[in-house]
Design a protein with these regions (language model features):
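Hydrophobic, well-structured mid-protein blocks that either form specific transmembrane helices
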Residues: 127-185
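Surface-exposed loop and turn segments in beta-propeller and other repeat-based domains
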Residues: 53-56, 96, 100-103, 178-189, ...
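Beta-rich, blade/repeat-based domains predominating
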Residues: 59-70, 103-113, 142-156, 186-201, ...
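A short helix->beta-strand "capping" segment at the edge of beta-propeller domains
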Residues: 38-60, 90-96
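Conserved beta-strand positions in repeat-built beta-propeller and related beta-rich domains
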Residues: 75-79, 117-124, 158-162, 204-216, ...
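Blade-loop segments of beta-propeller domains
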Residues: 92-130, 134-146
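C-terminal motif of bacterial Sec signal peptides marking the signal peptidase cleavage site
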Residues: 15-18
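Short loop/turn segments that connect beta-strands within beta-propeller blades
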Residues: 88-93, 131-135, 169-173, 225-229, ...
């Protein structure tokens, strides 16, 4: 991604992305400014992991969003003609209930907020809303791409594959504010993908982080300060599921879920055969 493209995407994101049900209607996005990123630093820590438990995962699931709720995993899977919203038994990996998206929709990020599930789509500009029992509860329209999705105590939080993360009103889908995330050397940290809000931080999977122009390190998650976009650290998950990664270069890490009651953290990837409960710890 060139500098001009990054700059253009940033301007476009802040000016137009936060629309409501009518993408052609007026909204307040033009008044929203991204929070300035702190001065670049080279002291960003890297964390590693310990596998606590391993669970089965559907190897056909092109995981794009993952959420833990009431002892079940809820998953958004992607690919045209294959995308689903599903409820999964954690221990067995069995799909308990599933809703298939239309063939023209590519499922993306997923979260649960205000007793509703929200599921983004990639380039279709549609967010699907479901009740807690997975029955449809409506749709919202937005401009731009949808990648990762999480929430804080007030807003939905959306990534679009750039280094911009937006905070969006769940009722109107208008952008309330936005942050930009830079690497420790000051360059944009692009390809921010699946998101999870954990203990006051945004954890963002970095899609294809192994690419030199992205990060040059495989299977990394960024820890981000939601107040200002400051990069708080990386989680190095390289080597966690080598067999899955070797099967296809697109079988990338892409699924983070958190159980706040027990502080369990779960990760998986696209078409991975396993889901991992991990403990994050400082890297020695």
């Amino acid at each position: 991604m060139t500098f001009m493209r990054v700059f253009a995407v940033l301007i476009f994101a802040l000016a137009t992305l936060g629309c409501g049900s009518d993408p052609s209607g007026s909204n307040n996005a033009s008044t929203v400014k991204a929070t300035a990123t702190p001065t670049p630093t080279n002291t960003v820590p890297t964390y590693t992991y310990e596998v606590v438990n391993t669970f089965p995962h559907d190897p056909q699931a092109f995981t794009q969003g993952l959420y833990f709720h009431n002892d079940f995993l809820y998953e958004s899977t992607g690919q045209y003609e294959e995308s689903t919203f599903r409820k999964v038994d954690l221990k067995t990996g069995r799909v308990v209930e599933q809703r298939k998206l239309g063939d023209d929709f590519f499922g993306e990020g997923l979260t649960f907020f205000g007793n509703k599930f929200y599921q983004l789509t990639w380039r279709e500009g549609t967010a699907f809303i479901y009740n807690a029992d997975m029955t449809p509860a409506g749709e919202k329209r937005y401009l731009g791409e949808g990648w990762g999705l999480t929430h804080d105590d007030k807003n939905l939080i959306i990534s679009d594959g750039t280094h911009v993360i937006r905070f969006v009103d769940p009722e109107t889908f208008k952008t309330v504010r936005a942050i930009v995330v830079n690497r420790e050397d000051g360059r944009p940290l692009i390809n921010l993908n699946e998101l999870e809000y954990i203990n006051g931080e945004i954890w963002a999977n970095i899609w294809h982080s192994e690419e030199p122009q992205i990060l040059g390190r495989p299977n990394h998650i960024a820890r981000i300060d939601p107040a200002n976009g400051k990069l708080l650290g990386y989680i190095d998950l390289s080597g966690i599921s080598p067999d899955d990664e070797r099967r296809d270069k697109e079988n990338t890490l892409n699924g983070i879920a958190y159980d706040p009651a027990t502080e369990r953290i779960f990760v998986t990837g696209k078409r991975w055969r396993r889901l991992f409960e991990i403990k994050v710890k400082p890297k020695q």
